[in-house]
Amino acid sequence: MLIQDYLDICDPVLTFDRFMGEIELEKYLKNIPQHYTGRLRYDPVSMLKTVLFGFMANGYISLRELEDQCKVNLRFMYLMDHQAPSYRTFGYFINEVLADSIEEIFQDINKKIFETEHVDLQHLYIDGSKFEANANKYSWVWKKATEKSRYRLFGKITTLFEEINEELSCTGMKLCINSEYAPEYLKEAAEQYAEVWQINEAMFVHGSGHRKTTQQRHYEKLKEYAAKLEEYVEKIKICGEDRNSYSKTDHSATFMRIKTDYMGNDQLLPAYNVQVGIADEYIAVVDVNQYRSDMDCFIPLMNKFYTTYGFYPKYPVADAGYGSYNNYIFCGQHGMEKYMKFTMFKKETTDKKYHEDPFRAVNFPIGEGGIMRCPNGKSFYLQYRKNVKGNKYGRQEEVYQCEDCSGCPYAEQCKKTDKNRTVRLNHELTSMHQEVIENLESIKGALLRMNRSIQAEGTFGIIKNDRWYKRIVRRGIKSVLLEVFLVSIGHNLYKYHNKQKKVATAA
């Protein structure tokens, strides 16, 4: 008897095999060497099917589990035709063959599923979750601490240069003193110093009972400071402009605050921010970020969606972590409706007293000539406009000050200082918030909010709790992205099989 004779007609491996049979898999296997020696090669198409089915069936599957399943599990035997590659073979296949084509595989599988299931891509439910990285917990490097240490080292270098210049005054050589130094300059200074004094490192003394010469001490300090400065430069370079930390054991991981504080000390842990866009319960787009805030992840995720499908979703629905000026402007520029909550959305919509508070600047009436007036009838005049730091769309805040707060009967309710009250406003952002409230408080908005909590948060619930994928296994952003794509493909195939099974059962 054949293996398939032992399998139920609705078995997931048969659904999977029929589905994958409609996709041209050979085009993803470009990295396989054409010439080889030794034993006959395993069929790469069967290897690809086995890896993808492993992630479909298990959520996440390790290399050794793949090897074991091929020996004892009928489903894996069916896909591999009774062959059982070693875990090393699977590791080579995933890391060398699939690494460059995994995103294309994810996109093509999605397009086939979406075409079959008539998935609506205009409504995209967005959410993010932080997954702990495979890095040591106390291996942090802080960018600001490194910068402070570097500036302290600059001071030590200046002091050393002053001592050396005093020593070399008779030779005519002088080291330039600056506020900052490069490692290359210190190495060059050490070479010049060694050349002047004919220093031979083989003659250096070490240990107790030996007294170092001035030349030896200065030369060793120059070498030490150059090495230390080089280390600081490398650490700051690894952090980059957008990060403030990284892990020594996984340079791509950033230290973040994770909800599952199993250490019980509110400690930051190395992690990755995984972002997904869900359409009809399927993961339509996925991205891995090093940003701690979800706000910074929205635009890269939408651009990735556009690259994949050729358009932006009409209704991107997200929680309050995504509502920002930049993201609202981006939505307006690309024809997307504003259905992302902002930070104070809940308070604005549920706290009537706060929403209608007459002492909030946004509730001040605007009189003739566009003059803003407080409840006491005093005018607020524009003092200056201030650019918001780090905003790429040029967001500005307008700073207004009351003409005179002296003797105001509402002073205790209105302000906390003895000076005239000052308020900061951005009328464009205020109007955006009002548009978001109108969108989300409508019947359509309420349904979209409900669907987002079911589909987007539900997807992470399934991945983490039902399919037991709670922590990143690989290291390095490229390998982590490969792993997340495999998990996402497995989730979508798992969903597809369940829906097909329901249809077959109902029929």
Predicted regions and their residues:
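Long, acidic, intrinsically disordered low-complexity segments
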Residues: 1-9
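A general alpha-helix detector
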Residues: 2, 46-52, 89
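Basic, short loop/linker segments at the boundary and entry of helix-turn-helix/winged-helix-like folds
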Residues: 9-49, 55, 427
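A Lys/Arg-rich helix-loop hairpin that forms a DNA/phosphate-binding surface
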Residues: 39, 81-82
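Anion-binding and metal-coordination hotspots
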Residues: 51, 59-72, 83-507
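Secretory-pathway/luminal and periplasmic proteins that interact with or process carbohydrate-rich
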Residues: 75-81
